[in-house]
Design a protein with these regions (language model features):
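Residue-identity detector for threonine
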Residues: 33-34, 69, 90
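Functionally constrained cores in energy, signaling, and assembly domains
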Residues: 46, 79, 91
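A short, exposed loop/beta-hairpin motif centered on an aromatic-Gly-Thr core
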Residues: 61-78
Length: 93
């Protein structure tokens, strides 16, 4: 089972914090900060999962989804433009 999305969490020693979400296309943006203070933005379309009771919830993408429905953008001059572009992406399903 994959855990449901949370506003803040830690994984691999990095801190993740929800920056924004687009309800219409299930796109999320999280700020990922390494212990050294390097900032990335992870933009992705959430996965739909079912819990043991059959309730649907959203989860973080798998590593294999990066480059397809998820992207990691290092903070910098054009980071926000890229984040906005991906946040508005449309999907056929």
């Amino acid at each position: 089972k994959y855990p449901p999305l949370k506003d803040k969490f830690k994984k691999y020693g990095d801190s993740f914090e929800l920056v924004s979400k687009n309800e219409s296309n299930r796109m999320y943006c999280y700020r990922r900060t390494t212990p050294e203070g390097i900032v990335y933005f992870e933009v992705f379309r959430s996965n739909l999962e079912k819990d043991d009771n059959g309730n649907v919830y959203e989860s973080y993408p798998r590593s294999s989804q990066f480059g397809d429905t998820a992207w990691c953008i290092r903070d910098g001059e054009n980071a926000m433009k890229k984040v906005l572009k991906y946040m508005q992406k449309t999907f056929s399903n």
